[in-house]
């Protein structure tokens, strides 16, 4: 297999990143359609983040095609009174998931956070991946977020 290259994202990559984000969304939330307007807003946010020093946006390329991305940041966490690193999204095309590329990108995100002065990292993990993260020895389960449809009537009453 030809080498996969990771690099900082550029503004021109943001449309492709948004398409990969939509793929990721469709995998993890097939029951909720991501609106085109939301994708357009995401492109705007990604373009802005490319030039911000506290934002982390990288892409993985194979044969000149973007096959994955990782998105994170560093910001002050008031409750903990410290600088924290965040990893919001990681997505790799299915045919490349066996390569440990996501793991390598996450490790790079952590190292970048350390260099920015962060002393703790937070990772948004999708429900299908939680079991793998819980087994990692260096990670503690910090918070769980649930979502519910506020429009649809539910037959289950609490």
Where are each of the predicted segments found?
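Conserved GNAT acetyl-CoA-binding A-motif
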Residues: 113-126
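Conserved catalytic-core motifs of GNAT/GCN5-like acyltransferases
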Residues: 124-128, 135, 140-154
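Conserved GNAT-fold acetyl-CoA-binding loop/helix
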Residues: 25-45
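Conserved beta-strand in the GNAT
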Residues: 59, 65-74, 86
């Amino acid at each position: 297999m030809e080498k996969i290259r990771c690099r900082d994202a550029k503004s021109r990559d943001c449309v492709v990143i948004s398409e990969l984000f939509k793929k990721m969304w469709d995998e993890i939330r097939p029951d909720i359609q991501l609106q085109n307007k939301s994708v357009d807003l995401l492109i705007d946010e990604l373009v802005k983040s490319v030039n911000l020093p506290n934002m982390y946006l990288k892409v993985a390329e194979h044969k000149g095609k973007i096959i994955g991305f990782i998105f994170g940041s560093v910001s002050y966490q008031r409750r903990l009174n410290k600088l924290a690193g965040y990893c919001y999204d990681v997505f790799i095309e299915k045919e490349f998931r066996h390569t440990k590329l996501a793991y390598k990108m996450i490790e790079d995100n952590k190292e970048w956070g350390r260099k920015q002065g962060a002393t703790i990292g937070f990772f948004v993990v999708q429900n299908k991946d939680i079991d793998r993260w819980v087994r990692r020895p260096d990670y503690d389960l910090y918070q769980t977020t649930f979502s519910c449809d506020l429009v649809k009537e539910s037959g289950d009453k609490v």
